[in-house]
Amino acid sequence: MVANSKESETLTGASAVTGLPQKRFYRQRAHSNPIADHSFNYPARPEDVDWRSLYPSMGDDQQVQFADIGCGYGGFLVTLGEMFPEKLAIGMEIRVKVSDYVIDRIAALRLKNANEATTYQNIACIRTNAMKYLPNYFQKSQLEKMFFLYPDPHFKRAKHKWRIINQALLSEYAYVLRKGGLVYTMTDVEDLHTWIVSHMTQHPLFERLSDEEANADPITPKLYQSSEEGAKVVRNKGEHFLAIFRRI
């Protein structure tokens, strides 16, 4: 699989002040139908993924350990890169313009911070459908952390099967997560939160962290405002519903 990081290209719509891409040039609808037949270039198996094209500075023994599923415009992914410079984190986004924005954003951050302590060489984004192709990218027990932040709630009952958390997909997540690995979920929709907690706690390979454990995690405070969607919820004085689960 050839992955294009676009670092050598001129960034379309980049701000003359910051050098970073501007979201107004990458607007797209809030969600995309995960069941529709989108056209994706995906690997046949994890061994075929050209990770070095995404992480030029990665070591020979390094693997991607963090996955931000439905990473949106990449705000939380950037935060992960800053918090864990020694870890490789991937953002997976189904919307073409949004994934283009994140790819361009990372390229601009790498260029701008080439001589800084944080170079953003440890984060990358790919356009894919994680509901279909996750096992094509990751080996068994490869991931340490997975993030599902403000996923599409699919309000209509007939579309609940499209929700990113369901019993069938949880078995795939358990496959790519190592034992002791964590799944972080955050939403501003209480009904979806209830759905997530119900399905995760019913699955035999996941257990929910206690409030004390969740609050002690250094990532937890970042879940509320690091992503663009989370920041919007804060601006609108909405509620956040957090649940973190451990792979057992």
Curated annotation (Swiss-Prot):
Its main location: nucleus. One of its GO terms (molecular function) is tRNA binding. Catalyzes the formation of N(7)-methylguanine at position 46 (m7G46) in tRNA. Pfam families: Methyltransf_4 (PF02390). It is found in: Nucleus. This is tRNA (guanine-N(7)-)-methyltransferase. It catalyses: guanosine(46) in tRNA + S-adenosyl-L-methionine = N(7)-methylguanosine(46) in tRNA + S-adenosyl-L-homocysteine. Keywords: Methyltransferase, Nucleus, RNA-binding, S-adenosyl-L-methionine, Transferase, tRNA processing, tRNA-binding. Belongs to the class I-like SAM-binding methyltransferase superfamily. TrmB family. The lineage of its organism: Eukaryota, Metazoa, Ecdysozoa, Arthropoda, Hexapoda. One of its GO terms (cellular component) is nucleus. The active site is at 152. InterPro entries: SAM-dependent_MTases_sf (IPR029063), Trm8_euk (IPR025763), tRNA_(Gua-N-7)_MeTrfase_Trmb (IPR003358). NCBIfam families: tRNA (guanosine(46)-N7)-methyltransferase TrmB.
